[in-house]
Amino acid sequence: MDARVYWIWLQNAFGAGSAKPVQLVRRAGSAEALFRGGIGLWSSFTFVSDRELAAMSAYGVREAEAALDYCLRLGQQVYTPDTPGYPDLLREIYNPPAVLYVRGTLPDASGDIAIGVVGTRKAGKAGLRAAREISYELAQEGAAVISGGALGIDSEAHRGAIDGRGRTVAVLPCGLDYPYLMDNANLRREILDSGGALVTEYPMQTPVQRGAFQTRNRLISGMAHGVLVAEAPKKSGALITARYAAEQNREVFVFIGEDTAAFAGCIGLAADGAARIRTAEDILRAFSAQRKSARTALLRQAAENVARPARRVRVVPLSDSAAEAAEAEKTPAAPQPEAGLSADAQRVLASLGGEPKHAAVLEAETGLSAGSVLAALTELELLGKIRSYPGQRFTKSD
């Protein structure tokens, strides 16, 4: 049986965004060995919750095999951490996707510089122009542009790269065949026609769910060597991508077109150490060694990133993601308690104390999925209930 089937089984059991599938495979030796070990082996791992054990038992490989066959019949690529073609940069992050579904052609991280370009959906003229022009210049210099395929800054970044005859990748928060944001259906076709790719960790026919945008954002930064925030107000979801970039030891860049509320998030990032830029050359200068000898330099940077401490970036709550979710198919929200917190947020908050605790620990302690934990943390950040630290660690606020 194709080894990817066992990874799909794991992805089905744990959902998108969890670090546990890769951790389990490392301990078991292979995804197949993990599957064949059965409940006796799985229950020996103390960080796997009872609910996750039940999911591992409930999902079978026949369903996973059918899913793989379906994707391959449609001409899509399915990558797992142990297959050629899986992005090397994603192997570096804490929670790499167990399965990556791809339509089109991914850039070669060992030879191409990749820059994530993100920002608000409701951008003004200055931010939109900067996103398009800088992405155009990046493409002209051979860099790949990674973004989220949404309206606003994302769309301009993709179109700039296409106009520059470069390659661009849209990382989606749903299955590749789900009718997400049909206003951009033509853009997605243009991305493929220009030699780029559509990427997701969600199985086919998966709609946009609560927390999917935040979970997806770690892949935009994870697939890139650096991330540019082209325009972001104080409560933009793009700032979560910047936080991921810092935690993943990626370079963080900001464009500040005006000293106004529209760029308040970018101004805050600059105050916290992000590099302020005006042109693509400002970004590429940070990767000058790679441009001279791409393969050698990029591999050296990957090795250095493992040891380099994460850059501290201030965490701010989301508003753009909430607006995006309103466009998508919604999952009914749980009834809100009197305290004003969702049930998931209550559980996460109850697990936190004065000592920083990693998001993966919160998953294990609460029994929630990675996406649910991330959504709960975002809610708690919005209300000022928690503080965040580099490396996806959190405490209760003072």
List the predicted regions and their residue ranges.
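Short, small/acidic-rich helices and loops at N termini and domain boundaries
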Residues: 1-84, 385, 397
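Glycine-biased, small-residue-rich flexible motifs in mid-sequence functional cores and linkers
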Residues: 1-3, 80-398
